[in-house]
Regions:
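Oxyanion-binding/catalytic loops of NTP- or PPi-dependent enzymes
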Residues: 1-86, 91-99, 106-120, 127-343
């Protein structure tokens, strides 16, 4: 049996770790990053995965797949899929055999299932871990959101198998977060934990009880369609509205501009966490009705972003209150609050 790794297969980023004598250690990928971007792009009859795919996204927006986790275990008949199609630049469709109980994406004119795309990401994580560890990696524990359906869990397991891994266990992300952040489950006295996990594409809120080395989920709530991507969209919508107003141009059909905008919105969002203002600069990708080149140079304030974000934050608060109510607890009953997630 080869080495065992733990994988956080995220909507936006994925992380690999291993446990040894020195405890849990995150494994860097071949790009010397602790996080691998959950992005796959078609390039010259092959695939780029992670940062290389992300860097080429503006050049090949229709052949670059992001946020595939949101499509795992879904079907073309799911009502939420229509809104997802509008927010992504690559094609999302039912398989060519006409089955509405499945879904696929297209890259370079070929169809791929979400399981196949996820398997490509997992394969890179496996290969990079083997490179870093110097040993074969054969087994993995993979995390999924607490509210994932059995169909979505099965799809994740299938992706792991396609990547050449023996999936030892699928573990829910809140429990994994509690373990990873060192909350001591060995205490004999029962403790309650509220895990608030706002990821790139999904939101999870879970109430856990820990005692004598064991965790139990008292209640879980979540929103598959609420995450960092939605906060990015606030900034993207602001830029699109400004471009329409200032230049009389709708940039939505310019896929190269929109891909670049998505990358710039993430940078702006992160900048606004520590600065009162951020600048979005995208030169030369748009033209006006006279075919003159347009440069987009806009500022967005933290106050504007915070105000527009309030409805999204309110959703997470409402789900948190619902989870506490279902668990028959109040905030005074919570011993630990763990806030997890990134970007």
């Amino acid at each position: 049996m080869g080495r065992i790794i733990g994988i956080d297969l995220g909507t936006t980023n994925s992380v690999v770790a291993t446990v040894g004598a020195g405890g849990c250690k995150i494994i860097q990928n071949k790009e010397a990053e602790q996080m691998t971007r959950s992005v796959v792009g078609a390039y010259k009859n092959d695939f780029l995965i992670g940062t290389p795919a992300l860097n080429r996204w503006p050049l090949a927006p229709r052949d670059t797949v992001i946020s595939i986790k949101r499509l795992m275990g879904r079907s073309a008949s799911d009502p939420e899929i229509e809104s997802v199609k509008k927010s992504h630049l690559y094609e999302i469709t039912e398989p060519s055999d006409g089955s509405r109980e499945a879904i696929c994406v297209k890259m370079a004119g070929e169809e791929y299932t979400p399981v196949e795309i996820s398997a490509m990401i997992l394969k890179k994580l496996k290969t990079d871990a083997e490179f870093a560890l110097g040993d074969p990696v054969t087994h993995a524990v993979i995390t999924v959101p607490a509210y994932f359906s059995e169909k979505q869990i099965d799809a994740t397991r299938e992706a792991g198998i396609k990547a050449g891994l023996t999936v030892m266990k699928i573990i829910d992300e809140p429990t994994a977060a509690a373990v990873a952040y060192g909350i001591d489950s060995r205490e004999q006295e029962a403790k309650t934990i509220l895990v608030y996990d706002l990821g790139g594409g999904t939101f999870d809120i879970s109430v856990l009880m820990m005692s004598a080395g064991a965790y139990a989920i008292l209640d879980r709530e979540g929103d598959m369609w609420l995450g960092g991507d939605n906060f990015d969209q606030i900034i993207a919508d602001y830029v699109i509205d400004c471009v329409k107003s200032e230049f009389g141009v709708d940039p939505a059909e310019n896929h190269r501009f929109m891909a670049t905008l998505r990358m710039e919105t993430k940078k702006a969002k992160e900048a606004l966490s520590s600065a009162p203002m951020a600048t979005i600069l995208i030169p030369g990708l748009l033209r006006d009705e006279d075919n003159d080149i347009l440069d987009v140079d806009l500022d967005i304030t933290r106050d504007y972003f915070v105000e527009k974000s309030r409805p999204l934050v309110a959703k997470t608060v409402a789900l948190s209150k619902k989870a506490l109510k279902n668990a028959h607890l109040t905030m005074e009953d919570i011993d630990y609050v763990l806030m997890a997630g990134r970007r």
